[in-house]
Amino acid sequence: MNAIEKPGLHIRSYLPHFDANCLLQHIVLSARKGVDLIHPELAQIIENGIRHYDRNRYCLLAWCIMPDHLHIYVVFLPTQLMGRNVLEWKSWITRTWQIVSGTKLLIFNPDYYDRYLRTLDQASKAIGYIEYNPVVAGYVVDPKDWRWSSAWHKARGWEAGNDWRPLFLPSGSR
C-alpha cells in the first residue's frame, strides 16, 4: 500500500500532506509553466473532472479555476482518500486534454498543496477565499461572474451538498 492509498501524514517531494477520512480539505493544484487552465475547452474538462464524483466519492463545496492554478474545497467520504482522488483528477484531466488537443502536454505540476480545515468558521472563510480569488486578481468585480467557479454555478442553481456535515461535526454538535 503506497502513500496515496493509506491515511496519515505523507511527506513526498516538497509538501507534506495530511490525509484522513472526512476532513474538510482545501486543495490547490498548480499548472505547469505555459499551461492556461482557463482555456475554455481545458477549463470545461477540469470542471467535468472535479465534479464527476461529487456526492459519490466526496462532497464538493467550492472550486475556482484560475489561469495558473485550481482551488478545490472538498470533504472526502469515509472510504475515499485525498491522494488517490487528486491523482485521478490530474490523470483524467491530462489524458482527456491530450486526446482533445492532440498534444502530449502535461497540465499540472507533480505535487499539490492541501490544508485541512478544523472549524466551520474556517470552512466558511475558505469558500469566500476560493470564490473571491478572481475578484482579488482583478478578472471580475463579482465572484458569480467568473465562469470557472462554484460561485458562477451557485448563481445558476447549483448547491453544494450538505452530506458532509454529519461526517465532520463531532457528535452532539450537529
Name each region found by the language model.
Residues 1-174:
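Short catalytic/metal-binding and nucleic-acid-binding patches
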